[in-house]
Amino acid sequence: MAAVTALGSLPRVAAGQVRVFPPAPPAVSPVEGLIDFHVHSAPDVFGRAIDDDESAALYMARKAEAIVLKNHVVSTAGRAFLLRKHNPGVKAFGGIVLNGAVGGINPDAVQWMWRMQGGYGRLVWFPTFDADNHVKHFKDAPEGVKVVGADGKALPAVREVLKVCAQQKLIVCTGHASPPEALALIEAARDAGCDRIVVTHAEFEVVNMSVEQMKKAASMGAKLEICAMGPLMGPSAHLPWMRHWRQVTYKESAEHVRTVGAEHFILSTDLGQTGNPSQPDGYAMLIAGLMGQGITRDQIKLMGRETAGKLLMG
């Protein structure tokens, strides 16, 4: 019978050496101190992998600074209040998306949203999946909720919403508007006195701003959102519905940051869908991908904490 080899004589993996197993958890969480400006979680009408409490718990464990809850059909201002109440230490914010479920471009809906107990309803997204640009792009319907008229200028109802946003210092997000529509929204928002404006996932197919349009938006004071979901989409995406969206590569996003300037961007995930990475894991993937393309940790902090923090809490 062959002698049994002593365990101590087997070749060992040196401390810190990685072969076919994951490395040890990082000493410092990649998302520590950062803000996720675009979190999807249950309850929802769409499949979500985890709920508000679970999303917050994952981010708290990784020492993130704050999260923004987004839902396409209902306000999340009240959910942010409850999340904070049940999870001391969590900084959660919410808002409202002006889709058909809340009456479209509805100033009253915005008024009631920001009045919700706690005052954590801070964002107003213009239409997303009901946006005229979105439904026409994906051929979902002949027309959707419009934000501009035939003259390319913001509609009167849009201007009424923007007045409320200016009065209450709410963050105006362009939703799934086309680049010309988004620029018209930014112009109208500035005219109304709004100074907190975000171009929602500026790189995604349904928006897909050119570099020159990004520069124009930035020159008007808007911040541009980069989302962790972008690199997961495209023809080879692991989920069928994501194959309808163009992939946004880390290389692309890094080039936008270098060309337009890191000070004009914020970071988000747009994650929470069933089958996708958790929001913190997706955020870590985004950070690693951008840094792999030459973006520095200081630039990550600028986009993921400083700029986003000024919008939310400044």
Residue ranges and their predicted role:
Residues 1-7, 280-314:
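Mid-to-C-terminal alpha-helical segments outside catalytic/metal-binding sites
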Residues 18, 25-26, 52-57, 79-82, ...:
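Histidine/acidic residue-rich metal-binding segments in metalloenzymes
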Residues 42-44, 74-78, 99-102, 131-134, ...:
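Active-site environment of divalent metal-dependent phosphoester hydrolases
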Residues 18-91:
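An N-terminally biased module of ancient metal coordination in phosphate/nucleic-acid-related enzymes
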Residues 2-20:
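N-terminal twin-arginine translocation
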Residues 227, 262-279:
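Short acidic/histidine-rich active-site segments
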Residues 33-39, 67-69, 93-96, 124-126, ...:
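Hydrophobic faces of well-ordered beta-strands that scaffold small-molecule active sites
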Residues 37-47, 129-131, 136-153:
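Glycine-rich phosphate-binding "P-loop"
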